[in-house]
Amino acid sequence: MLYFRVSAMGSRSRKCSGVGDISFAERKIVMSSWENNVRKVVPYTPGEQPKEKNIIKLNTNENPYPPSPAAKAALEAFDSDDMRLYPAPDAAELVDAIAETYRVKPEQVFVGVGSDDVISMAFMTFFNSDKPILFPDITYSFYDVWAEVYGIPYKRIPLTADFRINAGDYSQPNGGIIFPNPNAPTGVLESTEMIESVIKANPDSVVIIDEAYIDFGGTSVLPLIEKYENLLVVQTFSKSRNMAGMRIGFAFGSKKLIKYMNDVKFSVNSYTMNRVTIKCGAAAVRDGEYFRATCAKIIGTRENAKKRLSQLGFTFPDSMSNFIFAKHKTASAKTIFEELKKRKIFVRYWNKPIICDYLRITVGTDNEMQALYDALEEILKEAAK
């Protein structure tokens, strides 16, 4: 930016000044003017990550069990000297392991730094229409953040009173569709038939199904990628694979869809997956026995939690995820949230319309859940006085 000022000597009435020549007041203007060109967004708010020890963490839907022994062995066997080398841009070892496990071709697999990275890349790649993309009004709150960041028009579609998707609402003109199945934060699972009806009604749009929680009782729509070229199915290692800290997400789609995503990815950052992640991820995804065993434990604990929470006066939509979206009949969700926190038990609460009466409770170990029930019983007794 150029500034003109009068010379005290009068030899030159005006001059072109740099920042070093101008007054403090003028300098403030120069230093702040860059903000006019900043993309300002309201960022996504992640779940609280408490630093203290001896807590019960049921607020971010992490898996309460350790990673696969195969992943641990891969970590221990990793040669630290390899850290000086760039990883393979195509992460072929991980991609091949995922393709082998899910019985698809490697060309139908995309990997990224968690499913957030995968979906963000999909937004960048596929949602470039002047028409709004569509997603539920109660859903994963990162969707509207990505839309804002990338300047994508969007429209929130209301769920039904029982937190379900009405397929007909997604037949309107759009620039793309995304929703989770099971939904987050409700845990409600939609049928494959309903999802296919949405895909059929939108042949000119990419439809993204976010299956972060599908392994806890749902049926993946993965087989439909062979039938619909415009379908992208996204999954993650963060929930059912016990590896949230490794940040591994992946997607399935037609070869054409995946090629477009890789073209964009390699134009932004070729080396998204580090060497340790590739090795450990490949080992973990091949350990099907451990994966199925931990999922079964979480499902069993979840079903018991439904009974116990019902006995304590909670209602909730039937969850097919690793969490329960619960509302108490009389006690305030905010009060319960705060009282649990005092007892070092962390759950998720949103002070937002429609869902402000609900708590999202991650399914922990049986011991963690028993501590939760004991604390809730105590809190509810105090609230009833």
What residue spans do the PLM features occupy?
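PLP-dependent aminotransferase class I/II
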Residues: 230-310, 314-317
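Conserved PLP-binding catalytic core of the aspartate aminotransferase-like
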Residues: 299, 311-343, 359
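PLP-dependent aminotransferase-like
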Residues: 30, 125-180
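PLP-dependent enzyme catalytic core of the Aspartate aminotransferase-like
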Residues: 1, 23-28, 193, 339-348, ...
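N-terminal "arm"/small-domain region of PLP-dependent enzymes with the aminotransferase-like
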Residues: 29-85, 173
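Active-site phosphate-binding strand-loop segment of PLP-dependent enzymes
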Residues: 2, 155, 160-215
